[in-house]
Amino acid sequence: MDEKQRYDAGMQVRRAVLGDAHVDRCLEKLNDFNGEFQEMITRHACGD
């Protein structure tokens, strides 16, 4: 599984667990400080 596939799978799990509204709010608040962390959480905590 490549990084994009892992991210996509993680996003599906993240949305199923946390709900679309919460995930959408998090994505709207992405910035230089938290962007890489949010991506890492989505790929590794939810996608693996």
UniProtKB/Swiss-Prot annotation:
Metabolic or biological pathway, per its Swiss-Prot or TrEMBL entry: Aromatic compound metabolism; beta-ketoadipate pathway; 5-oxo-4,5-dihydro-2-furylacetate from 3-carboxy-cis,cis-muconate: step 2/2
Q: What is its EC number?
A: 4.1.1.44
**Which reaction(s) does its UniProt entry say it catalyses?**
(R)-2-(carboxymethyl)-5-oxo-2,5-dihydro-2-furoate + H(+) = (4,5-dihydro-5-oxofuran-2-yl)-acetate + CO2
Q: Where on the tree of life does the source sit, at the highest rank?
A: Bacteria
Keywords, A to Z, come to:
Aromatic hydrocarbons catabolism, Decarboxylase, Lyase
Q: Which InterPro entries match?
A: AhpD-like
**What EC class is this?**
lyase
GO BP: catabolic process
Which GO molecular function annotations are given, in alphabetical order? Answer: 4-carboxymuconolactone decarboxylase activity
Assigned protein family:
Belongs to the carboxymuconolactone decarboxylase family.
Q: What is this protein called?
A: 4-carboxymuconolactone decarboxylase
Q: Which organism is it from?
A: Pseudomonas putida
